[in-house]
């Protein structure tokens, strides 16, 4: 087992190095992709959506979704909101970045934002703290706030859910950090293996990036470099 873990860490984790991380303004939480908000007026006027909401209310549901089409959900104040799925590509995301003059973290910048340069698998150590309240772990007491959804040392919500992978960009290539789309958990590998992908240093080397963004699993975090002429560098 130890040998398997060592091989896994060697193959799926970035290697230790020394880097200079320049000052950044960082979005506190990641943003979802592909989903476009529905206006209140449009939601009220659409008879099909109103029927879906009424059926959900009868069943006591707070959310109803048609895969890659529409999602209707109830907010904390019991109002219903909605969003439409709009297929998008990494090329479109890159254009949006250029048009709106923000950036995405590089791989090493994201690792620092999530781990603060820690030399352990997770920011808190090399193993799962079983007192944590973790998402997708049915055997845990999931009442209340999830532990990893709290602000970290930089005030960021980051690396909190293995199903949610963040898009990073460096050297003209997109890649993922912070999750594997839930593959390890869905594969029945348990809490430790299932949560390896939230490690600051996890990198799925076998995963290839296609043309299209997966709105169910792909997220992004805007950053602004104080001096946009520099990124992280080697020491």
What kind of region is each of these model predictions?
Residues 59-66, 140-142, 200-209:
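Low-complexity, flexible helical/coil segments
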Residues 71-188:
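Functional-site microenvironments in short loops/helix caps that host divalent-cation chemistry
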Residues 3-7, 101, 144-145, 198-204:
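A short linear-motif detector with a strong N-terminal bias
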Residues 41-43, 48, 121, 139, ...:
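General N-terminal targeting signals
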Residues 42, 56, 117, 129-131, ...:
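Residue-level detector of solvent-exposed, low-hydrophobicity positions
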Residues 150, 154, 159-235:
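Surface-exposed recognition segments
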Residues 49-54, 128-131, 190-194, 201:
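Glycine-rich loops and low-complexity Gly/Arg-rich segments
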Residues 1-104, 210-235:
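Extended beta-strand/loop cores of jelly-roll/beta-sandwich
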């Amino acid at each position: 087992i130890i040998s398997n873990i060592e091989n896994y860490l060697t193959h799926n984790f970035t290697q230790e190095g020394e880097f200079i991380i320049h000052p950044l303004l960082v979005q506190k939480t990641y943003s979802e992709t592909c989903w476009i908000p529905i206006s209140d007026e449009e939601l009220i006027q659409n008879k099909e959506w109103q029927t879906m909401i009424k059926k959900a209310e009868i069943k006591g549901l707070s959310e109803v979704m048609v895969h890659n089409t529409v999602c209707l959900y109830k907010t904390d104040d019991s109002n219903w909101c909605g969003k439409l799925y709009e297929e998008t590509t990494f090329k479109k995301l890159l254009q949006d970045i250029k048009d709106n003059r923000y950036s995405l973290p590089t791989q090493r910048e994201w690792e620092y934002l999530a781990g603060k340069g820690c030399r352990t698998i997770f920011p808190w150590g090399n193993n799962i703290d079983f007192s944590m309240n973790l998402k997708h772990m049915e055997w845990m007491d999931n009442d209340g706030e999830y532990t990893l959804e709290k602000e970290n040392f930089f005030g960021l919500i980051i690396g909190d859910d293995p199903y949610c992978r963040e898009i990073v960009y460096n050297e003209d290539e997109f890649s993922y950090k912070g999750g594997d789309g839930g593959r390890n958990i869905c594969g029945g590998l348990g809490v430790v293996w299932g949560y390896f992908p939230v490690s600051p240093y996890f990198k799925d080397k076998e995963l290839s990036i296609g043309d299209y963004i997966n709105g169910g699993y792909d997220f992004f975090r805007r950053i602004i470099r104080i001096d946009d002429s520099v990124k992280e560098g080697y020491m």
